[in-house]
Curated annotation (Swiss-Prot):
The keyword Ribosomal protein belongs to this UniProt entry's keyword annotation: no
Gene3D superfamilies membership: 1.10.10.200, 3.30.70.980
PANTHER family: TRANSLATIONAL ACTIVATOR OF CYTOCHROME C OXIDASE 1
Location in the cell: Cytoplasm
Main location: cytoplasm
UniProt GO MF annotations: DNA binding
Protein name: Probable transcriptional regulatory protein SUB0364
Record family assignment: Belongs to the TACO1 family. YeeN subfamily.
Amino acid sequence: MGRKWANIVAKKTAKDGATSKVYAKFGVEIYVAAKQGDPDPESNSALKFVIDRAKQAQVPKHVIDKAIDKAKGNTDETFVEGRYEGFGPNGSMIIVDTLTSNVNRTAANVRTAYGKNGGNMGASGSVSYMFDKKGVIVFEGDDADTVFEQLLEADVEVDDVEAEDGAITVYTAPTDLHKGIQALRDNGIETFKVTELEMIPQSEVTLEGDDLATFEKLVDALEADDDVQKVYHNVADF
């Protein structure tokens, strides 16, 4: 499972990196975190978390610094979080999280992306009840039992710890993600491949042929929108 999450990050970075969209999206997220709190990541845990994730996605330092500098300025640009749920082909479900300065624009764009690419946008709650929000931490290692014990000793609410292909994947309660990361750092883990809040599907579907092609086109269209931060789904091996 650790390889799965690392591969998802690598795939997304490679795909988005060609157009620098991943940089722009992290730039907005960093700006918002810095604007809402202290622009110093050492005293703003939310900002530090976003910066760590940006580094995992290979966002250059100058992009990170530019977003923080913008937050230090007099700009009053406001961003609002949003969520749009919908359906793709053959039982596939999609959750889209956005961060936008223009909610009407974003809602229209997401609805269009669904409608023109083989999907249907549903009502709020129509899909999310089939997903569980969890913290996901991935790093190199193979001793899941020891990691599990270390996290329990640190009073971290852990759902599961898996070891596969030289990587350990930790699933935490969403409220304990930061505590879990710190506990692992306290036990000598310095480098993380993934530290994310994820919506994990309770069950997955497998798509093939035209259905898979349609689904990929739909996800690509959603992720291409500058206001879309995350796309979650229930399709296996995608």
